């Protein structure tokens, strides 16, 4: 979510019997085994003479073959399409992938080589497990969504498909008071198209669809116990936009490599801008330089707070603040074929209760009811109007606007460059262990 300036069959063990296989039975020889038994019965009957021969040979009932996977029924499950199996049922004992690990450089290299420092980092295991679980959920849903989204689909269908998958994988549907604060959506699914760079999700009744020639930014968050994983990608169907998408990917990777404890924000911004603005894109016979959107930034992430207070610029100059140990950052880049500057535009859909919300008297009764529901269900996590609809709220706009004007709830309107331009986004989370 953008910050704006001014922002296997689990080890199945078979009995290793040392006795010789009966009648030359092989590993794949069920049929041979049955035939051999019948032969033995015939020999026994012949040895008993006429009495045995007179007896009808009993037919052996064929053995029931075990169903594939039955032996591993208690083992890990596999994911479905769309994703609906909670990840803790796939990754047993919370053994989630660690993700990409970058070694500390220069004067911070001791954090990698010191056994004591690495031991202290491992003491934060519960904290990291929450992040890794959230990251695995995000990766799974992101991977599925890339293949699933097709031209002609409505934005509402796409947003709800992603959000239903996230809730299923966390195991929390968020329909009971407080459930959405245990785990679920870190913030609403952003589906910002073309010149709109961020903070757009469909409200109820929205009829917009994604078209073949569109450039859509898919930005959604997953949280586990308030640890928010914020990641985004740009989806296109026409290869003409490939360079625009690649510019953001490469710039984000440059920012991630530059980031680290004691690194100045301005240095990260310079590295990002150098890579981003080395690209250009040709659209309909006209060549456009890819520009950084200079008033959009990455940001630190707090506990239950998507914008933690520090910003990571994507252009050179400016903030000399350093990254510190124990902090989590969303390294986020935006490229544009337009002016490289965004303004508030279109209908607002994203909101969040302020962590420093003032205590003021609310004279609108619907505002009081709505605030109580927001506090119970979202806390300071961002939400959108569709989430209020999902909880059964009706005719709440007056109360919501009252909360915004009172400074209790922050509104995040869509951020757009000039019409006719195209914008792209790439984002990943980086965590710097504390010692």
Swiss-Prot record:
Record key words, sorted: Aminopeptidase, Cytoplasm, Hydrolase, Metal-binding, Protease
PANTHER family per record: METHIONINE AMINOPEPTIDASE 2
Lineage: Eukaryota, Fungi, Dikarya, Ascomycota, Pezizomycotina
Pfam families: Peptidase_M24
InterPro entries found in the cross-reference section: Creatinase/aminopeptidase-like, Met_Aminopeptidase_Type2, Pept_M24, Pept_M24_MAP, Pept_M24A_MAP2, Pept_M24A_MAP2_BS, WH-like_DNA-bd_sf, WH_DNA-bd_sf
EC number: 3.4.11.18
Residue span of region Disordered: 1-87
Amino acids binding substrate: 199, 307
Bias-annotated ranges (Acidic residues): 32-46
Reactions catalysed according to its record: Release of N-terminal amino acids, preferentially methionine, from peptides and arylamides
Binding residue positions for a divalent metal cation 1: 219, 230, 427
GO MF term (any one): metalloexopeptidase activity
Name under which the protein is recorded: Methionine aminopeptidase 2
Alphabetical list of HAMAP family matching this protein: MetAP_2_euk
Biased segments, Basic and acidic residues type: 10-19
Bias kind Basic residues: ranges: 55-68
Cofactor note: Binds 2 divalent metal cations per subunit. Has a high-affinity and a low affinity metal-binding site. The true nature of the physiological cofactor is under debate. The enzyme is active with cobalt, zinc, manganese or divalent iron ions. Most likely, methionine aminopeptidases function as mononuclear Fe(2+)-metalloproteases under physiological conditions, and the catalytically relevant metal-binding site has been assigned to the histidine-containing high-affinity site.
GO BP annotations listed: proteolysis
Enzyme category, top tier: hydrolase
One GO CC term, this protein: cytoplasm
Bias (Polar residues): 20-29
UniProt: a divalent metal cation 2 binding residues: 230, 299, 332, 427
